[in-house]
Amino acid sequence: MGTHLAKLLSKERQDCVLIDENEDRLEELADYDILTLQGSPTSIKTLKEAGAEAADLLVGVTPDESRNLNACILAHALGTRKTVARIDNYEYLAPQLEPFFKNLGIDSLIYPEVLAATDINNGLRMSWVRQRWDVHGGALVMLGVKLRETCEILNKPLRELCGADDPYHIVAIKRGAETIIPGGNDELHNLDFAYFMTTKEYIPYIRTICGKEHYADVKNVIIMGGGKTAVRAALTTPDYMNVKIVEADERRCEKLNELLNETDTMVIHGDGRNIDLLLEEGIKNTQAFVALTGNAETNILACMTAKRLGVRKTIAMVENLDYVGMAEELDIGTIINKKTIAASHIYQLLLDADVSNLRSLMTVDSDVAEFTAAEGSAVTRKPVKDLGLPSGMTIGGLVRNGKGMLVNGGSLILPGDSVMVFCHENNLKKVERFFKQRSLW
């Protein structure tokens, strides 16, 4: 995770130092514009050498929770402005403990498995949607939908579909390997992956025009792999869903039964790739299959098998980013990557503007973020069409006084509005200047 984040920050031209005790791991980054330092992240000497006394952010994402927390505490004491630690103790996420950790010098805690489980359950709640992103508890919603021949709005110019009074905007289209930030002359085609921005009450309408009404709502779920992500997902699925976890390790099955004893989750000892086992466990009457083993290839193949057996909704955890493209080409469905989910959470701490809910969308090499417009910021001075936004940046909607609304060229953004920004191949540091107080043109 640290390596992925360091590469991301290097790409964004952030000065970055990566600390690791493993010299071989550091040598793998020789081709990147990243300064590496061999040493312990809990060594004051090493932290000083890395520049912790003047750093904007220290990120502790080793597999060792205690080491991450200690590194953050030490870096804060040395003068680092913000710190974030990766944890695996769910207790630490309790809201009442936030001031406690803040007093220790730890600004933010991330539990990647919890973040991934949230994405998984968002996908399970809407079987026809591959990605969902909510602003202000769903006042504004972005939906990523794979379009098929049943879609009513194919092969029509968007200017005929997405007028000022229409209940949705299309902020991006993925067509093959190409990402399109659409204009009025662009059209949607069969097999496109489209991102719709809408408000909560119009989600059923989007489902209808996309031709997805025949998708059965998810009631029965099979999860393959009984790791931490599976546990967090099973603990947070809606009560109306029946969840089965298939785990190959017998001792882990015993542990899962202990962890999930207060839920209705059924734990099954077996290989989730075994077709006879899947048939025995009712895969023909299962609406969603979630593959969460630690092996990307296994997860992809398992989802392909589930699809052949009639499961419409499949979700695969793909930690190896090299396999994400292949998973998309194979039409796996929803792809979960803990590295990008956690990196998005961390990256927003580097932005000076008031930004939250930042997400990286692997499928379209883009970011989507919720910015709050500051008093006197550039984005509040003119209608959207006159702002001179960078190419690849789209404002999809905003939330004002708790009410979601779409944005068009004539819209005027007010101070305090929460604004959804879709940003393709753009440095978010360039985007945030529009939302900061006393922004300069």
Q: What residue spans do the PLM features occupy?
A:
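Cytosolic regulatory regions of ion transport systems
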Residues: 1-441
